[in-house]
């Protein structure tokens, strides 16, 4: 009997590229995106292959930056079986042991989920391109999906305080977006949400958590480099960062990526 092998749809998909537009991460820079035709629903096998090639999902769109003279959007992933918490992460873990984890489907989201999302955007991202929030935006961004996404929810008794949207992959989980109660600053919920996703991937015996793009010249994205070891898709290959970079090293890496040429960045700390 022949064993069933899942078939990738990679070669059957139609790709498009956007015109230049303002970069969401770097001031005074333009960006372009390659994206899949959103009319096609893709399976886990295909999304997994695309993730290993540096693609991300947002709502029904699966995309990858394709920018002129800039390659700073580095896809990042954490090898969860090797991950070790730093002191800050250990404190966040200990501080949130009173929370309960629940798993749900985005399609089952209620007014409670939207109210938390609305407060989060209003109070944490009022200067971003997702402000002002709306129900339509919430549904297109987090409820609509071209794959079988799920929510990892954190509850304090009967109060929802954090939601992480995840995509299942054949080698891990893709961390799509997290929103949480902005009044719970002491808890470091953003940190704890990533730690819970790492734990969930470990429990499923998966290899990676895909954290999305790390942009060295964007301070708001530098938190991703706190999760060590961290693998970066650099010059077409996944390379491992085994310790946290200094601010100077981050700046040097960012400078080397302001070109379409291979970075040639051969620091021994990235293997």
Predicted feature locations:
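Terminal substrate-recognition subdomain of acyl/acetyltransferases
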Residues: 1-103, 208-271
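Residue-level preference for non-acidic, small/hydrophobic
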Residues: 117, 194-197, 224
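Conserved acyl-CoA
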Residues: 195-207
């Amino acid at each position: 009997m022949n064993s069933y092998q899942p078939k990738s749809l990679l070669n059957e998909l139609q790709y498009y590229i956007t015109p230049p537009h303002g970069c969401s991460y770097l001031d005074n820079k333009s960006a372009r995106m390659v994206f899949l035709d959103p009319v096609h629903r893709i399976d886990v096998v295909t999304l997994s292959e695309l993730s290993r090639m540096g693609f991300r999902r947002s709502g029904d769109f699966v995309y990858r930056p394709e920018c002129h003279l800039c390659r700073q959007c580095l896809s990042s992933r954490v090898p969860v079986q090797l991950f070790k918490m730093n002191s800050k992460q250990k404190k966040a873990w200990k501080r949130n042991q009173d929370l309960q984890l629940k798993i749900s489907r985005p399609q089952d989201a209620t007014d409670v989920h939207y109210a938390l999302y609305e407060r989060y955007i209003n109070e944490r991202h009022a200067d971003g391109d997702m402000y002002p929030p709306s129900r339509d935006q919430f549904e297109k961004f987090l409820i609509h999906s071209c794959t079988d996404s799920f929510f990892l929810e954190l509850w304090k008794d009967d109060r929802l305080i954090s939601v992480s949207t995840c995509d299942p992959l054949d080698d891990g989980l893709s961390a799509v977006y997290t929103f949480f109660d902005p009044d719970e600053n002491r808890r470091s919920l953003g940190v704890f949400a990533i730690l819970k996703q790492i734990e969930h991937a470990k429990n499923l015996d998966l290899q990676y958590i895909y954290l999305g793009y790390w942009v060295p010249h964007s301070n708001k994205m530098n938190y991703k480099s706190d999760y060590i070891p961290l693998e970066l898709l650099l010059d077409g290959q996944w390379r491992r960062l085994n310790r946290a970079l200094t601010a100077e090293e981050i700046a040097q890496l960012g400078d080397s990526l302001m070109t379409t040429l291979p970075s040639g960045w051969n620091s021994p700390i990235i293997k």
